[in-house]
Amino acid sequence: MKILVCLKQVPHKDARLELTSDGSWIQDANIKFEINDYDNYALEEALRIKDKDAASEVVVLSIGPDRVQQSLRTALGMGADRAIQIWDDGLAHADSLAIAKSIAAVARAEKCDLVLLGLMADDTNFALTGPMLAELLDVPHATGITSAKFEGGQVEVERELEGGALEVVKLPLPCLLTVQTGMNEVRYASLKGIMQAKKKPLDKKSLADVGLSAGAVAAKVKIEKIFSPPKGGGAEILSGSKDEVANKFVGKVKELGLL
């Protein structure tokens, strides 16, 4: 089985974030980055499949400037076989559809049996790339999975729904799955794995290399502004005995016209 795992590099959880001058995104020049948490679980699931079937190949892919190579090397150190980086100036302001189109071009060329992604990205929480990618590849998909069992050319997955409910879905291969956090226990790269990762192939591709133009991945969605929610007026503490506090509370409610 050939498995493509899509990894997004996001700002480190401890990074001190500042907005750009136009307020459209964060300044990313001098902050630390890490693999998106959801994607770590997707990678771990792929590696567990490979643990059971040594003939399986795990290919990791990330879209971004050269800093993403660090995350790709980490994935190789954990056990992935190959890495692919896609970057082009035309992707500098890419939206979810542009990212999905870029991944789809690679997935078609690789002829993958399974595509795995995290449910969403820690920095945007859109959860759009997976379903868009499945549509572009014309393959069945399931989102937010918490378990997967592969047998006889198909996979049975459990999906996490609202309210704690679980849904069981069967899909034929090839297919695409987006993974929920907590699906498994993510491994660390061993020292041996880190050393081996230096010798594993990491292929950097441009849009032209994957058969796309800048126009084909032009963003349809633009983030206009990011801002912190306005601060509230604070809270008023009512003091006194129980009866006094109750009377004051009723008075305040009447004063606000709520009673």
Language model segments and positions:
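N-terminal glycine-rich FAD/FM-binding segment characteristic of electron-transfer flavoproteins
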Residues: 1-259
